[in-house]
Structures are given as C-alpha cells and as structure tokens.
Regions:
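N-terminal leader/linker segments that precede catalytic domains of diphosphate-processing enzymes
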Residues: 1-150, 154-225
Length: 225
C-alpha cells in the first residue's frame, strides 16, 4: 500500500519474479498463518490543473527503506495515536503526512474529499487499511521533499505516470497503478472532485494468488478471486 512500513523478520518473502504491474511490492512478506490486523493509514492524492488539466503529485520513498524502498507513491502514512478514531483520524493523518512528506499545508480536514479505501491482502504480513483522499494544491504553495523518507517528488498526469512506470523510469506498486488507471479517465480536477463527492466508497481488499514462484494480485470480480 501507499502507507509506509517495515518488513517483518519472520515469514517468507513473496516471489520476486511477479509481473510488476500486478504483483506485490518487493520486500513484502508472505503470511502463511492467520491474517494480521491491518494498521489504519491515510494517503493524499494532491491535484493541480485548470479546467482541462489534471496533474497529481507522486513522491519517491528513500531507497534506504526496507519496505517499498525507491517506490513512487502518493504521500501518506499510518494514523498516529491521539489522532482520534474513524474518519476524523484518517483525515488528521492525511493532513499531517502531506505536510511532513511534501511541505504542503492544507487548510484542514475539510479540504479533503474521500476517494477510496484499500486494504492490504490477508496473505501479506504487513497490512494497512488505507483511506485515500483527494485534495487540491493550495494557492501559493509548492511541494518540497523532506530529505528523509521522501527523496524526490514530481507532478504527473495519470497517463504520464503509467508510461514512466512502463518505461522503467519510476517504480510503482499495484494500488498506485490501479488508482492511476482510474484517474486517467478524468480530464480535469473539477470533474474528478465532482465525481468523488458523489461516490459511495467501498473497501477494496485484493488477494494474492501464488502460482509456483509467481505471485499475482487479484481484485474483486477477477477470475480466481
């Protein structure tokens, strides 16, 4: 998921020769036993653009990270103790993480529009229940890297991010790819925000299918899910 985490010391690694577009992230740990409880997390899809434009911010995690090192993600992270419960906690974490990772200060939780909710597959050791929010870039603000967890950032259209991934210029993981594929269907920030405000968000929990040395991620409705 787009939330940060550390690989556990125990548990076998998921096969590393999975197809990049639909495989688990390198370093994720396969959990052969009972599913672990997902940690609550939040992520922000920061948007900019005019009436006929839509760009979004991706940040690159430091290659030194043991989990998803060097991967480009939407800014985000785990909910901290003291940030409340439920939607309030997810919104507070989203605002905080965007400020910490990209130096963008939103006016407050009301600046966020709920877009999606993804839960890490039960077959993976480290799990997150991540709530994704949309937010417009505030006036007179520009993102900046924190120099720690985040080492690079850039603006992409959804299509250009997917092309950069296919060309091997940036590394993306499954949830980010699937979000970009959906976002590519919108031509402007306003169109996307209008859609999201009316959307009934339902949780998406993929499954990992192990086929010998190859792992694939399946979504609800896929054959074999």
């Amino acid at each position: 998921m787009s939330a940060p985490g550390e690989s556990g010391a125990s548990g076998g690694s998921l096969p590393r020769n999975a197809v990049p577009v639909d495989g688990p992230a390198a370093g994720e740990q396969y959990n052969p036993g009972a599913a672990t409880t997902p940690r609550q997390a939040a992520s922000v899809i920061l948007l900019r653009g005019g009436a006929r434009e839509l760009e979004l911010l991706l940040v690159k995690r430091t290659p030194k990270a043991r989990f998803m090192g060097g991967v480009w993600v939407f800014p985000g992270g785990a909910v901290d103790a003291g940030e409340g419960d439920g939607d309030e906690a997810h919104r507070a974490a989203a605002v905080r993480e965007l400020c910490e990772e990209a130096a963008i200060a939103l006016e407050g939780p009301q600046s966020l529009v709920k877009f999606s909710r993804w839960i890490t597959p039960a077959q993976v050791k480290i799990r997150f229940d991540t709530h994704f929010f949309l937010a417009r870039l505030p006036d007179r603000q520009e993102p900046a890297v924190d120099g720690g967890e985040v080492v690079e950032l850039d603006w992409f259209t959804p299509q250009s991010a997917l092309e950069a991934h296919r060309d091997g210029r940036i590394a993306l993981v499954f949830p980010t790819i699937k979000h970009l594929e959906q976002l590519s269907g919108f031509s402007s920030v306003e169109e996307l925000l209008d859609y999201a405000r009316e959307r009934d968000v339902q949780p998406v929990e993929p499954k990992v299918l192990l086929e010998g040395e190859v792992a694939r991620v399946l979504l609800p409705g896929d054959p074999g899910y």
